[in-house]
């Protein structure tokens, strides 16, 4: 199984778009409240331009997609289910555990941890499924018939 760069690009883009939906449409109000921002502070952050942060977030989404594709290749996951299970294991083993330290040692609210890690969990499950199941189309040359 080779790395499918088209799948990595689509998976990274999907993860990035999910982040936009997650933190705007789905969880904007609780996220802002848990961050301790006033509505004015949140508006100021938006007005000051989020483009550099969004660009970096897109690049990190691509890096995550590529790293996940490497892990899937290493374990030989070739179905959506297998890809999602590998992503779940990586999420539980690295993301959820590492981010829990922000609750324990930085006094961040548990709700913020749940919002942030819910995004990573849903995103990684989707990326794992997509990356493992996406099959590269091969050109089919019909057999010569006489």
Where on the chain are the PLM-derived regions?
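Juxtamembrane/disordered regions of integral membrane proteins
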Residues: 1-146
């Amino acid at each position: 199984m080779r790395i499918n760069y088209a799948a990595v690009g689509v998976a990274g883009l999907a993860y990035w778009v999910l982040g936009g939906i997650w933190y705007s449409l789905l969880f904007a109000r609780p996220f802002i409240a848990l961050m301790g921002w006033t509505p004015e502070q949140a508006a100021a952050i938006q007005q000051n331009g989020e483009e550099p942060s969004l660009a970096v977030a897109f690049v990190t989404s691509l890096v995550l997609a590529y790293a996940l594709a490497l892990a899937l290749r290493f374990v030989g996951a070739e179905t959506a289910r297998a890809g999602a299970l590998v992503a779940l294991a990586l999420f539980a083993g690295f993301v959820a555990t590492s981010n829990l330290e922000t609750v324990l040692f930085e006094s961040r609210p548990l709700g913020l941890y749940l919002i942030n890690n819910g995004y990573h969990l849903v995103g990684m499950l989707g990326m794992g499924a997509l990356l493992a199941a996406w099959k590269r189309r091969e050109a089919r040359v019909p057999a010569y018939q006489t």
